Amino acid sequence: MAITDWPEDERPREKLLARGAQALSDAELLAIFLRTGQQGLTAVDLARRQLVSSGGLRAMLDLSPERMAHLPGMGVARRALLLAALELGRRYLAEPLERGLPLDNPDKAGQLLTAQLRGLPFEVFACLFLDNKHRLIAFEKLFQGTIDAAAVYPREVVRRAMEHNAAAVILAHNHPSGVAEPSQSDHAITRRLVEALGLVEVRVLDHLVIGDGGWVSLASRGAV
């Protein structure tokens, strides 16, 4: 049975407009993107297959464009639409914090940094540069690859902080494994940067480790 033959209040698009996006399942939301199904499959059926094939919604949305292309029914046009929507979501999450609002608690910083770093297939070390009222001056991704004490250069972080005339910074990096628990190396990096930035009177407010399910604040654990 085609979706057009379903009761109107069960069709994904009409259901979304009448009851809000929160009322739809993952497959129903994805079906709105797909618009049509395949031979013998409605858009909702096809969406379910894609979700099962990729291991769930989060795993699907974290796929690289190349791997996403192998999902059933995911052609170039659909892939482009989905990737564009994901980027719009990331920018929406980041934009409110780019207007000079104070980043005075881990939740505000965590929202911005999660939007930028979660789900990347490699480690990225980034920094929020703040003014003396803890308002955002700039966000920069400084290093990528295997992030350990040998791969993060305090001199470069200090240089960028001084170029931005920053009074404080919030450090962050992601764990591609999805597990946000800080490692011994994470603690070592934090200590080195606190010491180096302290020499130029730049405060390290926090170091956030970003995972799939959220983030861990080293400051909240007394490590900053």
UniProtKB/Swiss-Prot annotation:
SUPFAM superfamilies: JAB1/MPN domain. Zn(2+) binds at residues 173, 175, 186. The keyword Protease applies. Residues 102-224 form the MPN domain. Pfam families: RadC (PF04002), UPF0758_N (PF20582). A motif (JAMM motif) lies at residues 173-186. One of its GO terms (biological process) is proteolysis. Keywords: Hydrolase, Metal-binding, Metalloprotease, Protease, Zinc. The keyword Methyltransferase does not apply. GO terms for molecular function: metal ion binding; metallopeptidase activity. CDD domains: MPN_DUF2466. PROSITE patterns: MPN, UPF0758. InterPro entries: MPN, RadC_JAB, UPF0758, UPF0758_CS, UPF0758_N. Belongs to the UPF0758 family. This is UPF0758 protein ABO_0214. It comes from Alcanivorax borkumensis (strain ATCC 700651 / DSM 11573 / NCIMB 13689 / SK2). The lineage of its organism: Bacteria, Pseudomonadati, Pseudomonadota, Gammaproteobacteria, Oceanospirillales.
